[in-house]
A protein has these predicted regions:
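Solvent-exposed, flexible loop/coil residues
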Residues: 7-12, 20, 65, 70, ...
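N-terminal start-of-chain detector that recognizes signal peptides
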Residues: 28-30, 56-62, 101
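Catalytic cores and adjacent binding grooves of peptidoglycan-active enzymes
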Residues: 75-76, 80-140
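A generic short-segment signal for beta-strand/edge and adjacent turn/coil regions
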Residues: 26, 50-58, 91-96
């Protein structure tokens, strides 16, 4: 798969798949360009199709400065390369999302669980999904 560069201003409304647009992957600092891995989009579309509900992306591509400002963010986060997304789905648990993601990435990729339970500062839990070559799993 390929990592493609897009302009938030120019390509923001461009469809990457039936359910996802470029703007959904933009860094919260609104910097151009936005890097997005086409394989990540395919995985997220499969998750959307499986659960039949919208997938909310809370963090897609991140600039180095934005990543550095995030508490406990990995120094070489896959978000920096457009290969990661943090997602949640209304009415679907973190465990359900992660379990299905595991069927899509059984031997590689990153799947991180960030449950709401035990974290008063979180309005909902989320799952980190990335397309790295090695396999990595964690709970935070």
């Amino acid at each position: 798969m390929a990592i493609n560069a897009y302009s938030w201003a120019k390509d923001g409304e461009k469809n990457l798949s039936p359910s996802f647009k470029v703007r959904e992957f933009r860094c919260s600092d609104n910097t151009d360009p936005i890097f997005i891995d086409s394989e990540l989009v395919e995985i997220l579309q499969k998750i959307r199709n499986h659960f039949g509900k919208p997938v909310n992306i809370t963090s897609g591509f991140r600039t180095a400065s934005k990543n550095a400002a995030i508490k406990n963010a990995a120094k070489f986060s896959q978000h920096l390369y457009g290969k990661a997304a943090d997602i949640w789905i209304s009415g679907v648990t973190v465990e359900q999302i992660a379990a299905y993601a595991e069927t899509l990435l059984p031997n590689r990729g990153g799947i991180g669980r960030y449950p709401k339970e035990g974290h008063a500062d979180r309005t909902h839990g989320w799952v980190h999904i990335d397309t790295r070559a090695a396999k990595s799993r964690w709970v935070s």
